[in-house]
């Protein structure tokens, strides 16, 4: 007899891949702050990923993982990507190395691309979720959604649960995907070579079996992170718009046996007639090979998956590698995929149900964007949802998720459309070969796409949380509003510790007001600094208005000062308290100066800030610059936060200047 149950939750995340886990990790911080917040994450698989899948982590993703406390653990296991080798056919049709270029543009970030298989990345995120949420958030397996109802009339009611989900608990048998007869672990069961009906069949109860418990869940919000064949997206009726090529690629994770000289270096290889290969060196001597296959998709996109075996992929790889030898000593995983670029028309319904990751955009894996873009989707959504659920922000900010991430997804599709066709095309034999791809054009696209692929080039348009119109961009030329606030080295004033300023901007739901105090030893400049500090301590400042009386002054908006003096020329106590220098706290004032073991970083110059007059920069909880103004720009700061934050019932109120000469003992 089927059991039925009923429950309530604030957020239900469907899918425990990279997008779903990132959503859970960001939201776990708000669960820590508000333990009665109920966040659930479900997945139809009985276990997480152990082999294969995505593997590349780009610069911006690593920066975000650092702010979540995850980057160091992942980097300790990952394989570094530093140089890409380009191979093209010579006059005899044999591949030869024609160039080497940096994998990541030098200076673009303190990180550059690394690779580690998805299973290990997910493991680190899962451990972090358990730690931060005190095990309140766990992946529940195997569950599958079967029905979703949305009461749009209740969408704007903050206390309502307008989304009703019906979930079914699956048996272990039905939650273990078929491997299509291959002995090697593979992902053909969820690659885009199969139809939606075929994927659904993998997870249906066997004939004659009874379904498990049915649970009705009343949700405030739902996030669909359930992949390219997203059930959530289809239930919402959102269409994927775009096109597919007839190119088919195979993928191998293997320990190779080869005399190819760059087998442990990232490579882009174009052969004369046999197709192309991309090489991605992995951890533990594994190498990933993206191998273009000779087979093409039939009209309508139908593909016979039984034709794609490891042997077929290896055989084609041997042709492309000629005259070098190539074989596989150990095969860890394989799959095949059909190149296509599609993006859904909408990313949310009533700002109550959202979709993210592959559920709303699909593309080729060549530029290492799939996992990265998916994680950054929910990194963007998570802080906005967290602030709304904890009563700190207005629901209007949720509209900016679709505004920001749909625009980026479309840019990604356009980039991948060009890049994947250049990669899959046959090299031009000469300048008169109009059907072939110019290798010079390919290299140019590769280099130009480097910054885009790194994730550091995102520039969000004007919206509620990104105030370009009011900003005085000339005051911080390189802190471009809408782009991520780039980390630079600084010295912590209290003890002279050299550090990256980005490490101070942990992802915990706080906005930052970064006070570039400039030359604070100058009397005129210090007068400006004191006036700004007096504003922050006043009854009507954004700190006083939006901070609850029972909370620390920096718990909602974190004020951090960076001055351009040498720390020997000014003392911490010279800065006005408590706004800029909270009593007995020492991580609020930093200097752009040299230290015993590091030269002067010239970070003011890197940020494009005048070393005398300074500036004020507001940074969102996800690390993106949202407002640039000066020390007199309090009206702009007031206006920015008034459109986003909600005043608590009991406010912090005005603060009086601390007297450092008196003991509190």
Curated annotation (Swiss-Prot):
pH-activity profile: Optimum pH is 7.2-7.6.
A Gene Ontology molecular function term of the record: FAD binding
Function: Hydroxylates phenol to catechol. Phenol is the best substrate, but the enzyme also accepts isomeric diphenols, hydroxyl-, amino-, halogen- or methyl-substituted phenols and, to a lesser degree, cresols.
Protein name, entry field: Phenol hydroxylase
Essential cofactor(s): FAD
Catalytic activity: phenol + NADPH + O2 + H(+) = catechol + NADP(+) + H2O
InterPro entries: FAD-bd, FAD/NAD-bd_sf, Phe_hydrox_C_dim_dom, PHOX_C_sf, RIFMO-like, Thioredoxin-like_sf
Enzyme class at the top of the EC tree: oxidoreductase
């Amino acid at each position: 007899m089927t059991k039925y149950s009923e429950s309530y939750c604030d957020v239900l995340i469907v899918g425990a891949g990279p997008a779903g886990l990132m959503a859970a990790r960001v939201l776990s911080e708000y669960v820590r702050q508000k333990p009665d917040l109920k966040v659930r994450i479900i997945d139809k698989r009985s276990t997480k990923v152990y082999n294969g899948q995505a593997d590349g982590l780009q610069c911006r993703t690593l920066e975000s993982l650092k702010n979540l406390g995850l980057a160091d653990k992942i980097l300790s296991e990952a394989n570094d990507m530093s140089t890409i080798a380009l191979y093209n056919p010579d006059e005899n049709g044999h591949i030869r190395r024609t160039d080497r270029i940096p994998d990541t543009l030098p200076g673009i970030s303190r990180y550059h691309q690394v690779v580690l298989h998805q299973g290990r990345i997910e493991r680190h995120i899962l451990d972090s979720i358990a730690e931060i949420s005190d095990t309140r958030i766990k992946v529940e397996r195997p569950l599958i959604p079967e029905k979703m109802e949305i009461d749009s009339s209740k969408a704007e009611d903050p206390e309502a649960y307008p989304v009703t989900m019906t979930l079914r608990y699956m048996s272990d048998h039905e939650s273990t995907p078929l491997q299509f007869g291959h002995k090697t672990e593979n992902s053909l069961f969820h690659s885009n070579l199969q139809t939606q009906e075929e994927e659904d069949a993998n997870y249906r109860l066997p004939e004659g079996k009874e379904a498990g418990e049915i649970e009705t869940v009343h949700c405030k919000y739902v996030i669909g992170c359930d992949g390219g064949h997203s059930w959530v997206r289809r239930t919402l009726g959102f269409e994927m718009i775009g096109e597919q090529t007839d190119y088919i690629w195979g993928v191998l994770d293997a320990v190779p046996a080869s005399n190819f000289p760059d087998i442990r270096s990232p490579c882009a290889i174009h052969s004369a007639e046999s197709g192309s290969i991309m090489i991605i060196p992995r951890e533990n001597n594994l190498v990933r090979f993206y191998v273009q296959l000779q087979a093409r998709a039939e009209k309508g996109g139908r593909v016979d998956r039984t034709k794609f075996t490891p042997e077929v992929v290896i055989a084609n790889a041997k042709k492309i590698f000629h005259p070098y030898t190539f074989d596989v000593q150990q095969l860890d995983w394989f799959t095949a995929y059909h190149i296509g670029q599609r993006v859904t028309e909408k990313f949310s319904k009533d700002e109550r149900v959202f979709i993210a990751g592959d559920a709303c955009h699909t593309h080729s894996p060549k530029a290492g964007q799939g996992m990265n873009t998916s994680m950054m989707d929910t990194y963007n959504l998570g802080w906005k949802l967290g602030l709304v659920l904890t009563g700190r922000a207005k629901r209007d900010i949720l509209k900016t998720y679709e505004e920001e991430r749909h625009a980026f997804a479309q840019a990604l599709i356009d980039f991948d459309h060009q890049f994947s066709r250049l990669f899959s095309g046959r090299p031009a034999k000469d300048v008169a070969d109009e059907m072939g791809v110019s290798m010079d054009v390919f290299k140019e696209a590769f280099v130009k796409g480097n910054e885009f692929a790194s994730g550091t080039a995102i520039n969000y348009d004007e919206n509620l949380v990104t105030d370009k119109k009011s900003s005085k961009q000339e005051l911080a030329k390189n802190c471009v509003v809408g782009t991520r606030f780039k980390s630079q080295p600084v010295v912590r004033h209290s003890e002279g510790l050299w550090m990256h300023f980005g490490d101070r901007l942990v992802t915990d739901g706080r906005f930052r007001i970064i006070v570039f105090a400039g030359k604070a030893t100058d009397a005129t400049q210090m007068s400006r600094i004191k006036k700004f500090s007096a504003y922050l301590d006043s009854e009507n400042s954004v700190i006083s208005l939006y901070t609850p009386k029972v909370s620390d002054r920096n718990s909602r908006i974190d004020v951090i000062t960076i001055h351009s003096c040498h720390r020997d020329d000014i003392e911490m106590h010279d800065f006005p308290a408590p706004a800029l220098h909270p009593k007995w706290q020492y991580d609020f004032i930093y200097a752009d100066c040299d230290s015993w073991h590091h030269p002067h970083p010239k970070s003011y110059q890197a940020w494009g800030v005048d070393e005398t007059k300074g500036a004020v920069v507001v940074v969102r909880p996800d690390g993106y610059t949202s407002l640039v103004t000066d020390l007199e720009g309090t009206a702009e700061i007031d206006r920015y936060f008034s459109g986003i934050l909600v005043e608590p019932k009991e406010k912090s109120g005005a603060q009086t200047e601390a007297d450092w000469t008196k003991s509190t003992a």
